[in-house]
Regions:
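Histidine-/acidic-rich catalytic cores in large beta-rich domains
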Residues: 1-207
């Protein structure tokens, strides 16, 4: 996963964003490159060449100097590429054969998300940094990719007790429990499927 300066004709089509942060050379976009053990490129995908730029503007409260801001990439069970783009509130799966999305979810309800991944049961999971609703809070969301219906989620009770507006992630453990990183506060904790806290660590260092 890498960043690149967009060609001017593509950069001119990028919309949205609120902040005035810019790069002197233009607007950053991104690409994905797969290499073999010898370091040779075997597959490459550039966002601005494969999707409709106007359909995915930067969300409000995101910068204008970068389009997308991808923050996670992995393969699903079919070998296709799962990507999270924070600035667009977009998660999608790229068909490696066509270069097009075969799954996408774009909306404010994803809340500048991180750590989009597939679970062993075939469901998808994502860390929603800014979970919409009254008060500040985050959410770990497991959902059925065929319907986008919630299978399981975790929120703080009350909401503000679990909130990281940036970084962060979650991992489903072999036991069925979920390990969660609340990145802003250096907190790692484990919860059961019934959302019971069974382990917790808070780093004494803050950077």
């Amino acid at each position: 996963l890498g960043w690149e300066i967009l060609p001017e004709e593509h950069a001119a089509r990028v919309g949205g964003g609120d902040f005035g942060r810019t790069h002197p050379d233009g607007i950053w976009g991104d690409y994905i490159r797969e290499v073999n053990p010898a370091g040779e490129t075997v597959w490459e995908w550039h966002m601005h060449e494969n999707i409709e730029i106007e359909k995915y503007p930067n969300a409000p409260m995101s910068g204008t100097g970068e389009w997308g801001h991808p923050n996670s990439v992995m393969l699903n069970h079919d070998g296709d590429v799962m990507v999270s783009w924070r600035h667009n509130n977009l998660i999608a799966v790229i068909d490696k054969k066509t270069g097009q999305f075969n799954f996408e979810w774009c909306g404010f309800e994803l809340g500048f998300q991180h750590d989009f991944q597939v679970l062993e049961n075939g469901n998808y999971m994502v860390f929603v940094n800014q979970d919409p609703g009254p008060g500040a809070g985050s959410k770990v969301l497991e959902f059925d990719p065929a319907t986008k219906e919630t299978v399981w989620d975790y929120r703080g009770k009350p909401r503000y007790t679990f909130h990281s507006p940036f970084i962060s992630g979650a991992q489903r453990l072999w036991s069925g429990n979920t390990l969660i990183c609340e990145g802003m506060w250096g907190r790692i904790f484990e919860v059961t499927p019934d959302k019971e806290l069974v382990w917790e660590y808070v780093s004494p260092y803050f950077t």
